[in-house]
Amino acid sequence: MPTAHFQHSIRYLNVTNMLIFSIISFLLIYQTNSVVTLSRIDPAGAVDMGFVDVSYNNFTIQSPIHVPDDGTITWCVSKINCKYDYDEVVGVTAAAFDVWSMTGLVFKPTSRCDRAHIRISFKRRYHGDSDFDGEGGLLAHAFLPNQGALSGDIHMDNDETFAFSFNDADYEGDNAPTSYFWTVLHEIGHTLGLQHSSSKQAIMYGFYVKRSFNNGAVTLSTDDMNGINELYHSNEQSTHQSTRHRPHRRPSPDGSCRDERVLRIRRCRRRDRRRRRPKESGELVLCRSVRCHRVHSRRADHLRRQLHMETRSKRTALRRLSIANDDCVGFTTRFRGYIGVRMDGVHRSRHRQRSASVRRNSLPAQCNFRTKRHLSRSLTTTLCTR
């Protein structure tokens, strides 16, 4: 029979374990998934800025949603717990995404909610993350991008009475219903990476505000546009600079080539029976990128001349750089998915082609075997001859 002190110790350990478990659950929900809520009434006369990372004037941004290669962001409305007409909900939701498409982003509905980037569902009270408080108060909440498993989720309070009309007269009076359009329009901004704004004219203002539909001509405010531009369109413009003189050190591909498959041609050697020359080495780096990458011989003293870029069938742009001391030739080349290289109609002999070691298996995956063979032969001939 355990003593009273031992029983008290067991109860103390059980309470401690429950407390630790509760704290861990709280951290898993609220730290890995940054949730931002929308309230009907501003009780303190100020805007709750939520989880603020970076501030720009009135708007605040978190991080952009992961946009796939085709540039299309998919969204889905779940049928579970939806007490409204599903087709009407989807139609109004599509109208809200059309407003955000003014920023240049492309949205597409899908029926696969498990694969959609933005998922809209109806929840009530306790549902595993941030609780709702019933009718009135909190209207919805959304999870910011890149913050955990719930990133991109929009939860609408199912205890609220939402209206789907676009008529301003339907929202007059003290007991007027809540507009589903304005609510989901605000929450979509959170899933795109926008935080609350201090501007009452902005869609991302922290509290629900009755707005005019303007006969269907709903537009985003300048504050909302600035936030999207800062997240998605700030790094679109890039400049290309060409080097006419030999750099002090051998250049390497820039950051846009990090995840691309690279073709490297090495161990290029030119033999001359009349004069003994040391073994020369060169390297050609080719990657799938819109930028050009310069490669030159290690022992090249200076560039003798530089020819104009030639384009064949709009697939390949090739620039040939001749080296003064007859070392291996360097190139600037651009790859657009299919490559065919021609060097001024000059065909070299086979023993010159064999003087380079080419890794044909390391060519980009978009090239077929015929293209790989032609690319290897052409670039080997060009690289290893004068």
Swiss-Prot record:
Residues 235-258 are annotated as: Disordered. The active site is at residue 187. Its cofactor is Zn(2+). Binds 1 zinc ion per subunit. SUPFAM superfamilies: Metalloproteases ('zincins'), catalytic domain. The keyword Signal applies. Pfam families: Peptidase_M10. Keywords: Glycoprotein, Hydrolase, Metal-binding, Metalloprotease, Protease, Signal, Zinc. One of its GO terms (biological process) is proteolysis. One of its GO terms (molecular function) is metalloendopeptidase activity. It comes from the Viruses. The keyword Metal-binding applies. It is an enzyme of class 3 (hydrolase). Its EC number is 3.4.24.-. PROSITE patterns: ZINC_PROTEASE. Glycans are attached at residues 14, 58. Residues 1-34 form the signal peptide. InterPro entries: MetalloPept_cat_dom_sf (IPR024079), Pept_M10_metallopeptidase (IPR001818), Pept_M10A (IPR021190), Peptidase_Metallo (IPR006026). Zn(2+) binds at residues 186, 190, 196. Belongs to the peptidase M10A family. This is Putative matrix metalloproteinase. The lineage of its organism: Viruses, Varidnaviria, Bamfordvirae, Nucleocytoviricota, Megaviricetes.
